Amino acid sequence: MRLCLIPRNTGTPQRVLRPVVWSPPSRKKPVLSPHNSIMFGHLSPVRIPCLRGKFNLQLPSLDDQVIPARLPKTEVSAEEPKEATEVKDQVETQGQEDNKRGPCSNGEAASTSRPLETQGNLTSSWYNPRPLEGNVHLKSLTEKNQTDKAQVHAVSFYSKGHGVASSHSPAGGILPFGKPDPLPTVLPAPVPGCSLWPEKAALKVLGEDHLPSSPGLLMVGEDMQPKDPAALGSSRSSPPRAAGHRSHKRKLSGPPLQLQPTPPLQLRCDRDERPPPAKLPCLSPEALLVGQASQREGRLQHGNMRKNMRVLSRISKFRRLRQLLRRRKKTRQGRRGGSCL
């Protein structure tokens, strides 16, 4: 719909045109002016009534759109302390089975199995791969009790009369507990029947700094490292060298060194090898212009040859026509001469 402006009159209702009175034609030319013409009068715009209807827009409230967040339910696993106790029981039972299967030949090795078992129980709580959540206080208490038990076992073992074998002791190669050895001591190798796997795991996990501070357990920890019979013989003959060997083993027991990535190899052309291929020469703008000019000349020559061929063909046509005309003239002249005679 296109709205048009309609002039407003007071006497007539809106949107109704006033009737136009046509006068008879006169001799004078009518002059249109804004006074005597409706078209040139002052036009007033039509007023459009405002909309009376009301629209109620119902927008959803923000409270309905808010989704309440759900808190995740934390489930406390009650099976973890049971697993720790199961690991301890397994260590104790395996130590007892190893003692039953392989009886130790020396009394000293049999007596040292008790502090070793206590040390295995001590390190089993540290060697547990799954940390105990919520039982930190109980774990610390059990560790303290186990360390106290291990120290009591070690003190009782050395107080009963068992000594430490030494190659430089004055009386029978045995020193009483509490006296220092002038040179580093070397204990006999463990019997193959006795298993020392919990102590090895403790050494791997704890290292040297985290071992207990009691002298008996320290010496047991040193004895737990695997040794060959040849190495034992050399250590008995030369104790300072054995100490150096132990320090070398301790250095090697640290974290493995990370190898740095090797840089990529750069291939170079030697004298014996062939040189790299020569690069193509880059054409200068002058050479490009010369090449374009030569191409244009070739095109012009080709065009000129075509034109010349056309011209020659035309010339040959004209010559042929001339020859034909001459022949006709001769024949006409011969006919006229024969008729005159």
From Swiss-Prot:
Composition-biased stretches (Basic and acidic residues): 79-101
Polar residues: bias regions: 108-127
Organism superkingdom: Eukaryota
Pfam families per record: POM121 (PF15229)
Biased composition (Basic residues): 243-252
Region (Disordered): 72-131, 216-283
PANTHER family hit by this protein: POM121-LIKE, UPF0607 PROTEIN ENSP00000332738-RELATED
Family designation: Belongs to the UPF0607 family.
Protein name: Putative UPF0607 protein FLJ37424
Protein's organism: Homo sapiens (Human)
